[in-house]
């Protein structure tokens, strides 16, 4: 042995351990028996494992999650769960039962209150709250999974998977395990005998160790469908201001819309109000977006050139199949979503992100984490920030330059579009984000801020627009936020003279300053007033889920 050389070590411990576990499973081939899944998981998962469980925004590997919740905690315990979206009750049952201990995630939605309670009770430990692309990236660095539990529509007996319109996170999750000696188990709705019986192959069988036919089709949530009947006049007024005061003002051609009625109103005003302003062909041409049904009228009216999707949306399958020039589809005609690539597109390739939040402080820092609610962020921190690595220019990006300096770079538009008060008369604008105290109480190393104020270029409320990128300093920035914060404590902290000065300089605009009459913000401007109208716009191709049908 050479001087200083370390003793011989074993270089394939992960591979050897995987082989040991696979050998312990009494099956031939790659198909696990549906009725024996719990027992199989007890052989394939070991205490302390890092386990990826595919809960996505829409698609849920729910048969696998329900089965994981039934394993014996004496056999499987202290798991470190890595879940993009925590959306089902059994996702947290495993912590109450002691099967899992630590959680790294991005979004929790309906489980946000329960996560907060489990954290307070000491039954769950949070690693970090991530943005999606950040969580995927860590799978290839320090969160390399021992096991990945994922979902697909169909598989053949060799493990080839068809994930189709709901491909979503699956490729990113699977590759991290498959190429670092992790075990990959896929639940599917349908098992076929041969690859030729699959519409296409989205994940090759060599990446998959086992498939199991689920006891019922995997759960999928139409998370991004908004009923136009619920769009209020305030949403329409804000949408008018967005189109005229931001989209047209800065020539926004590529963009992402966050979820909500505010952005749904914008989509439904493009064929009407946008048309009145003569903006077709000048704005909103390229989208990174889930296939929002409320975008159908704009597509049919010729506004939209392309849409790349994070995930699918129930009921939109046949409409997408019939519009391959707009959507990304496979040779079989069905859409191919990909959240990792769409998040990258939303980070580097779009001019603007516009979305809502639950709280905004005086400097435009925002968060969806509030007292008693640990909801996570999803993709907003990724798309709602200015990536300093960007090197291509567009008119909107260049329009953010405020100084004639040859070394100045452009900036992504990041717009927080909120009403000054949430439901229940809770102010959106607050002196201090709840996230600060949540971090202290939970022992987090940093406050769970969704979008930092220095990335926010505009704040849009029913009062008006604050063009924050034009602020000369933090004091003026705070005054601009206050000028559109209404009668919240933040809004009452600025006097009328200062607001008048900001309006005179064009750093803050109210509807009247843009030639928008508040009385014009009526539902008659919406291109579709109901889900039935969206179906009609689609030529009958859109097939909305039952809960959105009123006929």
Which functions belong to the PLM regions below?
Residues 1-551:
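Conserved alpha/beta enzyme-core scaffold
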């Amino acid at each position: 042995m050479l001087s200083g050389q370390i003793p011989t070590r074993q270089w394939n411990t992960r591979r050897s351990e995987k082989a040991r576990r696979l050998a312990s499973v009494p099956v031939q081939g790659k198909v696990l028996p549906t009725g024996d899944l719990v027992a199989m998981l007890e052989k394939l998962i070991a205490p302390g494992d890092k386990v990826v469980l595919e809960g996505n925004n829409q698609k849920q590997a729910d048969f696998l999650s329900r089965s994981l919740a039934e394993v014996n905690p004496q056999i499987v315990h202290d798991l470190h769960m890595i879940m993009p979206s925590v959306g089902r009750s059994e996702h947290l049952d495993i912590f109450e039962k002691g099967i899992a201990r630590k959680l790294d995630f991005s979004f929790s939605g309906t489980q946000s209150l329960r996560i907060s309670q489990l954290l307070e009770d000491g039954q769950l430990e949070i690693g970090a709250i991530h943005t999606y692309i950040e969580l995927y990236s860590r799978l290839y660095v320090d969160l390399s999974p021992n096991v990945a539990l994922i979902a697909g529509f169909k598989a053949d007996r060799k493990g080839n998977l068809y994930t189709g319109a709901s491909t979503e996170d699956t490729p990113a999750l699977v590759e991290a395990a498959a190429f670092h000696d992790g075990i990959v188990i896929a639940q599917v709705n349908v098992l076929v005998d041969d690859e030729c019986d699959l519409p296409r192959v989205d994940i090759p069988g060599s990446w998959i160790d086992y498939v199991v036919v689920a006891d019922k089709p995997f759960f999928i949530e139409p998370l991004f469908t908004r009923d136009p009947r619920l769009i209020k006049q305030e949403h329409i007024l804000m949408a008018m201001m967005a189109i005229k005061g931001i989209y047209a003002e800065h020539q926004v051609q590529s963009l992402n819309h966050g979820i909500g009625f505010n952005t749904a109103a914008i989509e439904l005003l493009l064929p009407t109000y946008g048309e009145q302003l003569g903006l077709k062909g000048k704005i909103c041409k390229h989208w990174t977006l889930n296939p929002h049904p409320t975008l159908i009228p704009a597509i049919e009216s010729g506004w939209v050139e392309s849409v790349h999707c994070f995930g699918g949306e129930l009921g939109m399958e046949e409409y997408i199949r019939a519009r391959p020039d707009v959507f990304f589809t496979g040779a079989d005609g069905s859409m191919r979503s990909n959240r990792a690539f769409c998040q990258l597109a939303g980070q580097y390739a779009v001019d603007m992100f516009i979305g809502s939040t639950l709280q905004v402080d005086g400097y435009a820092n925002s968060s969806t984490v509030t007292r008693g609610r640990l909801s996570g962020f999803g993709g907003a921190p990724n798309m709602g920030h200015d990536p300093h690595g960007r090197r291509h220019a567009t008119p909107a990006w260049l329009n953010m330059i405020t100084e004639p300096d040859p070394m100045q770079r452009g900036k992504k538009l990041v717009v927080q579009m909120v009403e000054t008060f949430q439901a229940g008369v809770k102010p959106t604008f607050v002196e201090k984000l709840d996230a600060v105290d949540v971090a202290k109480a939970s022992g987090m190393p940093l406050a769970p801020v969704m979008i930092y104020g220095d990335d926010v270029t505009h704040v849009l409320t029913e009062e008006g627009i604050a063009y924050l990128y034009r602020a000369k300093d933090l004091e003026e920035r705070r005054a601009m936020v206050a000028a559109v914060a209404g009668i919240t404590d933040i809004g009452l902290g600025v006097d009328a003279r200062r607001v008048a000065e900001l309006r005179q300089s064009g750093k803050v605009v109210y509807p009247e300053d843009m030639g928008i009459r508040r009385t014009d913000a009526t539902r008659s401007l919406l291109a579709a007033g109901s889900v039935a109208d969206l179906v009609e716009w689609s030529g009958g191709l859109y097939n909305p889920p039952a809960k959105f049908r009123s006929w």
